[in-house]
Regions:
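Sec-dependent N-terminal signal peptides
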Residues: 4-13
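Sec/Tat signal peptide C-region and signal peptidase I cleavage site
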Residues: 15-20
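Exported/periplasmic ABC-transporter solute-binding proteins
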Residues: 21-47, 51, 60, 64-70, ...
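Acidic, polar ligand-binding/catalytic clefts
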Residues: 73-99
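Serine endopeptidase catalytic core focused on the charge-relay Asp
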Residues: 104
Length: 266
């Protein structure tokens, strides 16, 4: 039923909205840094006549903007926080959109000796036990939430002597890790964008714990009547349609596929 409603919204409020109210989309720095939105949003705008204003922040801040009614729709990657956002009545029509993954990067000489490990928790133990510098986003983003979660699962408590919370976006964190010869956890997309500028190496990948799902959620018009709910639902309908999912599937960075669509099982 939800899929039928989304299709109807897309058809009714599609290409005929030349003078439609712009859509305010709060999204993660990873979708912006990777270049994904710069590629696919123009296709949506061309198809529908809507203009999308993209606000690139961490997931925590994006959800807070939704809680304040300052945006129309959020595209984020922190499932537990997303569910709380919807349960509290701030968001509706949460839809699975796509996934990618996180990786651990660090110095080429890898003093923690995590290169080649097939166990994420052992890799974190190598960093913590050796007190090797680790740079954390520390910004309540989806990446930061994931990082804190895996430290907790490893039953490790980072110490101030080697752990740096910097309150910055992913690109800046990678730069700082590079300057400090430190380790960090990053989404793969931002890593690929930044890699040519860094002397870091990808040291760990592939653990199921590093799975990184993205959802898109409309801000609840019953709570904030001024939001552009029709625009938000139009964007959700397009991104989760066969056409939108194909654009996500076909997106490449340096020849590498970064995002895997999840809204349509094909």
């Amino acid at each position: 039923m939800n899929k039928i409603i989304l299709v109807l919204i897309f058809l009714l409020f599609g290409r005929y909205n030349i003078d439609a109210e712009p859509i305010r989309l709060a999204t993660t720095t990873s979708t912006e840094n990777s270049g994904l939105l710069k590629v696919i949003i123009p296709h949506y705008e061309s198809d529908t006549g809507y203009k999308v204003y993209v606000i690139s922040v961490g997931t925590g801040q994006a959800l807070r903007m939704g809680q304040d009614g300052n945006v129309d729709v959020v595209l984020v990657h922190a499932p537990k926080a997303e569910k709380r956002f919807v349960k509290a009545g701030y968001g509706i029509n949460r839809r699975s959109l796509m996934f990618n993954d996180f990786v651990i990067v660090g110095p080429y000489d890898d003093p923690a000796k995590i290169r080649g490990h097939n166990d994420l928790l052992r890799s974190l133990e190598g960093i913590a036990n050796g007190k090797h510098l680790f740079v954390s986003r520390g910004d309540d983003s989806g990446t930061h939430k994931k990082e804190l979660n895996i430290w907790q699962k490893a039953r490790l408590k980072p110490e101030i002597s080697w752990y740096r919370e910097v309150g910055q976006g992913m690109a800046r964190v990678l730069q700082m890790a590079n300057e400090l010869n430190a380790y960090t956890i990053t989404d793969r997309g931002t890593w690929l964008v930044m890699r040519p500028k860094l002397s870091l190496d990808l040291l760990f990948e592939g653990d199921p714990e590093l799975y990184n799902p993205y959802s898109i959620i409309a801000v609840n018009p019953a709570r904030f009547p001024s939001v552009n709910y029709l625009g938000a639902m139009s964007l959700i309908a397009w991104l989760t349609s066969v056409k939108g999912q194909k654009h996500i599937k076909n997106f490449r960075l340096k020849g590498e596929r970064l995002f895997f669509p999840t809204a349509i099982n094909k």
